[in-house]
């Protein structure tokens, strides 16, 4: 789910997905999307489990990180599935990287140098979306940066990475110059 904040609903979906995985295990390996932080274009609105695990209480990142770990752990241990999450906050990576087997860099984050560089040090598949504009060159530059060695400051430390050969594209739709939605599945739209 895009907003994995209702634990029991997520677990019900996970059990169904695990049943499907069993049926197709010879053809495909399913990784469950468990997105726990929601990017917001203007910063308003509910920001997900990471921010506010209890919607009736004040936001709490400490409680949010505990809830995120708990949810990923439950999906993994109770269903046997592995999980994917959007890496909205690179600083949260050390708290969840032992549980998450696939990371996504979203459309609003893909142009950010810190996301690109942190991705270059992740030892798991990391998908880069094209930005909200749909611009593919931005996504390709992000993939290039993530696949190559980088050195940068992260969490108050100098970091050197060797590159992530598993960085790849996640295609989403976009907008053309006139603001019209364009799909991501026609060859001619991808080349435009």
What are these language model-derived features?
Residues 5-190:
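Active-site-facing alpha/beta catalytic cores
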């Amino acid at each position: 789910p895009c907003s994995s904040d209702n634990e029991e609903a997520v677990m019900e979906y996970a059990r169904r997905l695990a049943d499907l995985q069993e049926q197709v295990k010879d053809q495909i390996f399913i990784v469950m999307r468990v997105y726990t932080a929601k990017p917001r274009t203007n910063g308003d609105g509910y920001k997900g489990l990471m921010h506010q695990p209890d919607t009736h209480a004040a936001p709490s990142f400490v409680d949010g990180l505990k809830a995120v770990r708990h949810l990923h752990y439950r999906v993994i241990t109770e269903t046997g599935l592995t999980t994917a999450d959007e890496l909205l906050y690179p600083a949260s990576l050390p708290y969840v990287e032992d549980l998450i087997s696939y990371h996504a860099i979203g459309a609003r984050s893909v142009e950010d140098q810190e996301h690109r560089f942190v991705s270059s040090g992740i030892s798991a598949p990391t998908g880069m979306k094209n930005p909200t504009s749909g611009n593919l060159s931005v996504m390709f530059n992000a993939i290039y940066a993530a696949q190559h060695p980088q050195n940068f400051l992260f969490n108050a430390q100098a970091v050197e990475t060797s590159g992530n050969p598993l960085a790849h594209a996640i295609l989403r739709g976009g907008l053309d110059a006139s603001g019209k939605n364009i799909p991501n599945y026609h060859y001619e739209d991808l080349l435009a």
